[in-house]
């Protein structure tokens, strides 16, 4: 169980980084366009 949770945590962190990258860029462009 410990190893499975560790792998899931790593996968979740990787997915979060992968999704957060474009999301931050989108927010920056959106705010720049809004301003």
From Swiss-Prot:
Family matches, as Pfam families: PSII_Ycf12 (PF05969)
Membrane topology: Single-pass membrane protein
Subcellular location: Plastid, Organellar chromatophore thylakoid membrane
Signal peptide annotation: none
Top-level taxon: Eukaryota
GO biological process: photosynthesis
Transmembrane segments: 7-27
GO cellular component, one term: organellar chromatophore thylakoid membrane
Sorted UniProt keywords: Membrane, Organellar chromatophore, Photosynthesis, Photosystem II, Plastid, Thylakoid, Transmembrane, Transmembrane helix
Quaternary structure annotation from Swiss-Prot or TrEMBL: PSII is composed of 1 copy each of membrane proteins PsbA, PsbB, PsbC, PsbD, PsbE, PsbF, PsbH, PsbI, PsbJ, PsbK, PsbL, PsbM, PsbT, PsbX, PsbY, PsbZ, Psb30/Ycf12, peripheral proteins of the oxygen-evolving complex and a large number of cofactors. It forms dimeric complexes.
Family from the record: Belongs to the Psb30/Ycf12 family.
Function: A core subunit of photosystem II (PSII), probably helps stabilize the reaction center.
Name used for this protein in its record: Photosystem II reaction center protein Psb30
Organism (species): Paulinella chromatophora
């Amino acid at each position: 169980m410990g190893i499975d949770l560790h792998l899931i945590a790593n996968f979740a962190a990787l997915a979060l980084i992968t999704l957060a990258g474009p999301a931050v860029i989108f927010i920056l462009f959106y705010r720049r366009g809004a301003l």
